[in-house]
Amino acid sequence: MNKEKLLKKKILSANKKIIHDGFKAKSIGNFGNVSCKYKNFCLIKPSGVNLAKTDHNDISVVRLDDLKLFTGKKPSVDTPIHAILYKSYPEIKAIVHTHSLYASSWAQSLKSIPCYGTTHADYFADEVPVTNILNSNQIKKNYEKEIGISIINKLKTKSLNPWQIPGILVAQHGVFSWGKTIDEALYNAEVIEFIAQLAFNSSFLNKKIKKISKSLHFKHFMRKNGPLAYYGQ
Protein backbone atom coordinates (compact mmCIF):
# COMPACT_ATOMS: atom_id res chain seq x y z
CA MET A 1 0.00 0.00 0.00
CA ASN A 2 1.48 3.37 -1.00
CA LYS A 3 1.85 6.13 1.58
CA GLU A 4 -0.88 8.40 0.19
CA LYS A 5 -3.44 5.59 0.25
CA LEU A 6 -2.42 4.67 3.81
CA LEU A 7 -2.79 8.28 4.97
CA LYS A 8 -6.24 8.54 3.37
CA LYS A 9 -7.35 5.43 5.22
CA LYS A 10 -5.96 6.84 8.48
CA ILE A 11 -7.80 10.13 7.97
CA LEU A 12 -11.07 8.32 7.34
CA SER A 13 -10.55 6.14 10.42
CA ALA A 14 -9.65 9.14 12.60
CA ASN A 15 -12.77 11.04 11.54
CA LYS A 16 -14.89 8.04 12.48
CA LYS A 17 -13.09 7.81 15.82
CA ILE A 18 -14.07 11.40 16.63
CA ILE A 19 -17.70 10.34 16.36
CA HIS A 20 -17.43 6.97 18.09
CA ASP A 21 -15.46 8.35 21.03
CA GLY A 22 -17.99 11.07 21.75
CA PHE A 23 -16.08 14.05 20.38
CA LYS A 24 -19.26 15.34 18.81
CA ALA A 25 -22.97 15.22 19.48
CA LYS A 26 -24.27 12.65 17.02
CA SER A 27 -27.68 14.32 16.76
CA ILE A 28 -26.29 17.75 15.78
CA GLY A 29 -24.76 16.79 12.47
CA ASN A 30 -21.40 16.52 10.80
CA PHE A 31 -18.70 18.69 12.31
CA GLY A 32 -15.04 18.20 13.05
CA ASN A 33 -12.35 17.11 10.65
CA VAL A 34 -8.94 15.50 10.43
CA SER A 35 -6.18 16.27 7.94
CA CYS A 36 -2.53 15.55 7.28
CA LYS A 37 0.21 17.08 5.21
CA TYR A 38 1.63 14.93 2.42
CA LYS A 39 4.34 16.45 0.23
CA ASN A 40 2.82 19.77 -0.94
CA PHE A 41 -0.75 18.66 -0.34
CA CYS A 42 -3.31 18.71 2.43
CA LEU A 43 -5.34 15.50 2.72
CA ILE A 44 -8.60 16.28 4.50
CA LYS A 45 -12.11 14.98 5.11
CA PRO A 46 -14.57 16.02 2.39
CA SER A 47 -17.29 18.53 3.18
CA GLY A 48 -20.58 17.31 4.63
CA VAL A 49 -20.17 13.61 3.87
CA ASN A 50 -21.74 10.63 5.60
CA LEU A 51 -18.65 8.86 6.89
CA ALA A 52 -20.43 5.51 6.92
CA LYS A 53 -20.73 5.82 3.15
CA THR A 54 -17.35 7.43 2.53
CA ASP A 55 -14.42 5.62 0.92
CA HIS A 56 -10.76 6.55 1.35
CA ASN A 57 -10.73 7.54 -2.32
CA ASP A 58 -13.19 10.32 -1.46
CA ILE A 59 -10.65 12.03 0.82
CA SER A 60 -9.90 15.49 -0.55
CA VAL A 61 -6.37 16.16 -1.77
CA VAL A 62 -5.79 19.91 -1.86
CA ARG A 63 -2.72 21.78 -3.07
CA LEU A 64 -1.26 23.83 -0.24
CA ASP A 65 0.00 26.63 -2.47
CA ASP A 66 -3.34 27.63 -3.99
CA LEU A 67 -5.94 25.44 -2.16
CA LYS A 68 -7.08 23.96 -5.47
CA LEU A 69 -8.65 20.50 -5.31
CA PHE A 70 -6.35 17.91 -6.87
CA THR A 71 -8.36 14.72 -6.33
CA GLY A 72 -11.27 13.52 -4.22
CA LYS A 73 -14.51 15.21 -3.22
CA LYS A 74 -15.13 18.84 -2.28
CA PRO A 75 -12.90 19.56 0.75
CA SER A 76 -14.01 20.66 4.20
CA VAL A 77 -14.78 24.35 4.55
CA ASP A 78 -12.09 24.43 7.24
CA THR A 79 -9.34 23.55 4.76
CA PRO A 80 -7.88 27.12 4.74
CA ILE A 81 -7.34 26.86 8.52
CA HIS A 82 -5.44 23.61 8.18
CA ALA A 83 -3.45 24.89 5.21
CA ILE A 84 -2.19 28.07 6.87
CA LEU A 85 -1.04 26.08 9.91
CA TYR A 86 0.87 23.62 7.72
CA LYS A 87 2.53 26.45 5.82
CA SER A 88 3.39 28.39 8.98
CA TYR A 89 4.69 25.46 11.04
CA PRO A 90 6.57 22.79 9.03
CA GLU A 91 6.74 20.58 12.14
CA ILE A 92 2.96 20.16 12.06
CA LYS A 93 2.13 17.10 9.96
CA ALA A 94 -1.47 16.41 11.05
CA ILE A 95 -4.39 18.45 12.44
CA VAL A 96 -7.60 17.51 14.24
CA HIS A 97 -10.56 19.86 14.69
CA THR A 98 -13.32 18.95 17.13
CA HIS A 99 -16.20 20.50 19.01
CA SER A 100 -15.69 18.30 22.07
CA LEU A 101 -17.96 19.24 24.97
CA TYR A 102 -15.72 20.54 27.75
CA ALA A 103 -13.01 22.08 25.59
CA SER A 104 -15.62 23.83 23.44
CA SER A 105 -17.31 25.08 26.60
CA TRP A 106 -14.08 26.83 27.57
CA ALA A 107 -13.77 28.20 24.02
CA GLN A 108 -17.31 29.55 24.10
CA SER A 109 -16.63 31.12 27.49
CA LEU A 110 -13.60 32.85 25.95
CA LYS A 111 -11.41 31.39 28.67
CA SER A 112 -8.07 29.67 28.32
CA ILE A 113 -7.83 26.38 30.20
CA PRO A 114 -5.69 27.09 33.29
CA CYS A 115 -3.18 24.56 34.55
CA TYR A 116 -4.34 23.33 37.94
CA GLY A 117 -2.35 20.10 38.04
CA THR A 118 0.41 17.94 36.69
CA THR A 119 -1.69 16.08 34.10
CA HIS A 120 -2.09 19.35 32.22
CA ALA A 121 1.61 20.20 32.76
CA ASP A 122 2.71 16.88 31.27
CA TYR A 123 1.38 17.94 27.87
CA PHE A 124 1.25 21.74 27.74
CA ALA A 125 4.01 24.20 28.63
CA ASP A 126 1.35 26.81 29.44
CA GLU A 127 -2.40 27.15 29.73
CA VAL A 128 -4.39 25.98 26.72
CA PRO A 129 -4.89 29.38 25.08
CA VAL A 130 -8.01 30.73 23.43
CA THR A 131 -7.80 32.92 20.33
CA ASN A 132 -9.14 36.44 20.10
CA ILE A 133 -12.65 37.01 18.77
CA LEU A 134 -12.79 37.86 15.08
CA ASN A 135 -14.24 41.23 14.16
CA SER A 136 -17.01 41.65 11.59
CA ASN A 137 -14.60 42.53 8.77
CA GLN A 138 -12.52 39.41 9.42
CA ILE A 139 -15.66 37.27 9.43
CA LYS A 140 -16.99 38.74 6.19
CA LYS A 141 -13.68 38.93 4.32
CA ASN A 142 -12.11 35.49 4.65
CA TYR A 143 -13.55 33.72 7.68
CA GLU A 144 -11.65 30.43 7.66
CA LYS A 145 -8.30 31.99 6.76
CA GLU A 146 -8.75 34.55 9.55
CA ILE A 147 -9.31 31.75 12.06
CA GLY A 148 -5.98 30.27 11.01
CA ILE A 149 -4.29 33.64 11.35
CA SER A 150 -5.84 34.11 14.80
CA ILE A 151 -4.31 30.80 15.93
CA ILE A 152 -0.87 31.80 14.67
CA ASN A 153 -1.15 35.27 16.21
CA LYS A 154 -2.08 33.83 19.61
CA LEU A 155 0.92 31.49 19.61
CA LYS A 156 3.22 34.35 18.57
CA THR A 157 1.78 36.69 21.21
CA LYS A 158 2.49 34.12 23.90
CA SER A 159 5.90 33.25 22.39
CA LEU A 160 4.89 29.61 22.10
CA ASN A 161 5.46 27.00 19.40
CA PRO A 162 3.45 23.90 18.43
CA TRP A 163 5.81 21.66 20.39
CA GLN A 164 5.03 23.56 23.61
CA ILE A 165 1.32 23.90 22.88
CA PRO A 166 -0.06 20.97 20.84
CA GLY A 167 -3.51 22.51 20.52
CA ILE A 168 -5.61 25.62 20.98
CA LEU A 169 -9.16 26.80 21.62
CA VAL A 170 -10.76 28.94 18.92
CA ALA A 171 -12.97 31.60 20.49
CA GLN A 172 -16.69 30.79 20.36
CA HIS A 173 -15.94 27.80 18.16
CA GLY A 174 -14.02 24.68 19.18
CA VAL A 175 -10.64 23.00 19.33
CA PHE A 176 -7.69 22.50 17.00
CA SER A 177 -4.89 20.09 17.90
CA TRP A 178 -1.86 18.98 15.95
CA GLY A 179 1.04 16.58 15.91
CA LYS A 180 3.73 14.83 13.89
CA THR A 181 1.26 12.09 12.94
CA ILE A 182 -2.49 11.67 12.65
CA ASP A 183 -2.50 9.48 15.75
CA GLU A 184 -0.58 12.09 17.74
CA ALA A 185 -2.88 14.92 16.68
CA LEU A 186 -5.91 12.83 17.63
CA TYR A 187 -4.35 11.92 20.97
CA ASN A 188 -3.70 15.59 21.68
CA ALA A 189 -7.36 16.37 21.00
CA GLU A 190 -8.28 13.72 23.55
CA VAL A 191 -5.81 15.21 26.04
CA ILE A 192 -7.29 18.69 25.63
CA GLU A 193 -10.80 17.41 26.25
CA PHE A 194 -9.65 15.51 29.34
CA ILE A 195 -7.79 18.42 30.91
CA ALA A 196 -10.68 20.75 30.02
CA GLN A 197 -12.98 18.55 32.09
CA LEU A 198 -10.38 18.28 34.86
CA ALA A 199 -10.07 22.07 35.04
CA PHE A 200 -13.85 22.53 35.03
CA ASN A 201 -14.36 20.00 37.81
CA SER A 202 -11.47 21.38 39.86
CA SER A 203 -12.71 24.96 39.67
CA PHE A 204 -16.23 23.80 40.57
CA LEU A 205 -15.03 21.88 43.62
CA ASN A 206 -12.73 24.65 44.81
CA LYS A 207 -13.78 28.18 43.90
CA LYS A 208 -10.49 29.52 45.27
CA ILE A 209 -8.26 27.08 43.43
CA LYS A 210 -4.87 28.37 42.32
CA LYS A 211 -2.83 27.50 39.28
CA ILE A 212 0.04 25.06 39.62
CA SER A 213 3.38 26.70 40.48
CA LYS A 214 5.62 27.64 37.56
CA SER A 215 8.42 25.45 38.90
CA LEU A 216 6.22 22.34 39.14
CA HIS A 217 4.67 23.08 35.74
CA PHE A 218 8.10 23.42 34.12
CA LYS A 219 9.38 20.27 35.82
CA HIS A 220 6.53 18.10 34.59
CA PHE A 221 6.57 19.44 31.06
CA MET A 222 10.32 19.10 30.62
CA ARG A 223 10.66 15.65 32.19
CA LYS A 224 8.17 14.37 29.62
CA ASN A 225 8.99 16.55 26.61
CA GLY A 226 12.40 18.15 27.11
CA PRO A 227 15.72 17.10 25.53
CA LEU A 228 16.56 15.09 28.67
CA ALA A 229 13.07 13.63 29.09
CA TYR A 230 12.94 10.65 31.40
CA TYR A 231 9.22 10.33 32.20
CA GLY A 232 7.64 6.90 32.16
CA GLN A 233 5.16 5.06 34.37
What are these regions (language model features)?
Residues 1-233:
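Glycine-rich flexible loops
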